[in-house]
């Protein structure tokens, strides 16, 4: 069994950075992509959403980050974790974290502690504890449940808004 950790980072210019793996010779291969979400309205007022290459991004743009992991080994793999920080100069868009067969948790302390949204606590301006807002999340963690067979892939994703 292997435990994999992928870190997805973006510079303030939102260029997709490198992945960091928990093991040097891992049977898990990761690929990462960042895409800009655009909305189009047709002549009848129907809105559709599509994804494009990042290109130029401006405040208010929505970016979708996707990490795909593939078992290139010869054995089943379990205990796969994917950890992604929310890039600087962005805010996480609530309920946008996705991943089949995964359990998702969040952090508000730069990845030191993870919990479900209802359990994330912050100190408010009045000094009282309150539940953290999605835009206050600093990191996202997916735990892949089950086993990943040789040749099988999985993916996780989340959206942010550029500040």
PLM region descriptions:
Residues 2-6, 20-163:
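Exported/extracytosolic protein signature
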Residues 7-16:
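Bacterial N-terminal signal peptides
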